[in-house]
Regions:
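Tubulin/FtsZ superfamily GTPase core signature
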Residues: 1-219
Length: 219
């Protein structure tokens, strides 16, 4: 199964509660001691400065990486050291953009550097299962109106991606309007994309989580 770890303020803002600082890695060590049968393991580390956090990333990798673990480091800040990092780490790449584009780029990197290269044997059905279980990027939360960030969304050549959206329930009609705008926009993506919407209520918060799945049949 997969894990997401972040370093720096920018990744934490992008991924919210999904982001975990790599210093707090006890649960990862415990998880590696009891792997899920039939699944290879990989970790995605996201940082807003590989130069600044290089020692912390190295320390984390030394504490959890063994012969069967694959990992990648994604940097939200390009630097002159990028070639050195590519030579040093198993997989290193530069990502950036807004919240939605960042998630799509992460999935693209997983496909290009881990799945497509044959490092592990996941296909896209397996990747969807992993994402749905929340072991990787389960959701990116957007509160309030959806129109603003929808305008910045551009479909890229990814075969699989997902979103988790959180809406305030202060105005019931506003939620309906947002869902209509969201559904209309997603239906324009790719070749016959499938849109699935699931509503879940939190008992401790007056909010609903909307999980949207879309996928294209061509990469």
């Amino acid at each position: 199964m997969s894990q997401l770890r972040c370093n720096g303020k920018v990744p934490t803002i992008v991924f919210g509660e999904v982001a975990r600082d790599i210093v707090a890695c006890k649960e990862v060590v415990d998880w590696l001691k009891s792997p899920v049968p039939g699944f290879e393991d990989f970790i995605v580390i996201i940082t807003d400065s590989a130069v600044e956090y290089e020692e912390r990333i190295d320390a984390f990798l030394q504490s959890v990486v063994n012969g069967r673990l694959y990992y990648m480091v994604l940097d939200m800040n390009d630097s002159l050291d990028r070639q050195r990092f590519r030579n040093k780490w198993m997989s290193y790449n530069i990502i950036g953009g807004n919240k939605v584009e960042t998630v799509i780029q992460i999935l693209h990197n997983i496909y290009a550097h881990i799945l497509k290269t044959g490092m592990i044997s996941y296909d896209f059905t397996d990747l969807q299962y992993i994402l749905k279980q929340g072991c990787f990027v389960q959701s990116v939360c957007f509160k309030g109106e959806l129109s603003d960030w929808l305008e910045s969304f551009h479909a890229q050549a990814n075969a699989s991606y997902s979103f988790g959206l959180t809406l305030n329930l202060d105005e019931g009609e506003g939620v309906k309007d947002n869902l209509y705008v969201l559904h209309e926009r997603l239906c324009r993506l790719g070749n016959n994309p499938e849109v699935k919407i699931s509503l879940q209520s939190y008992e401790d918060e007056e909010m609903e989580t909307i999980v949207i799945w879309t996928y294209d049949d061509e990469y």
